[in-house]
Amino acid sequence: LPLSEIYEVATFYAHFNIVKDSKDYNPVNVVRVCESLTCELFGAHKLLQDIKKLENKNIKVVPGPCMGRCNVAPTVCVGKNYVDVANFDKVKKTIDEKNFDPFIPDYINVSSYKKNGGYEIADKIKNGVISKKQVLDSLNESGLKGKGGAGFPTGKKWEIVSNYNGKKYVAVNGDEGEPGTFKDRSYLESDPHRFLEGALIASYFINAQKVYIYMRDEYPTVIKILLDEINKME
């Protein structure tokens, strides 16, 4: 693998730290000021300049791309902890208190989800109580389409993959990452099992071997919630 390709990937993702020599690398707490269009409109550029004054040997302040929190702009990520509707005083307080870990909000956990009928449909599909034809008919009748831009009918997509002979996998893009998109983070932080059950239903329908979930590093809260809840289910 050419070093140029490694460098290309490493410099593309904002959460990689590029250093000239690993011997000189000093792990620090990184403070990232979102510089998306929305945050810029709410004064992110001036905020970045002000917060730069807080830099020391343990704190590094850098700009960062859209963090999926456009509804609470401007936002600043202190370590893994987000300061929403941020200002200098709020960020300084968070740094002084060494509050670097992600905040975990109240959400629907696996026991609460199951009490309200969660995973019943997935289990019925897995056990054949609900047939693949019934699933396909429901998808087609609903008119559900992909949200990635092409608007491809979900039922047709599942049918094509289901008929494929060979190893199959479900790959879930947890967030598209474009500016203004915070709907994914919002429901994943509040109702994660609706998402997980949907992934399982897709995997049972196409007879997938595994489900892979991609989640951007800007969503540490979602990552922790999903890991904790998946561990409970295992």
Locations of the language-model features?
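Feature of Fe-S/electron-transfer and energy-metabolism proteins
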Residues: 1-234
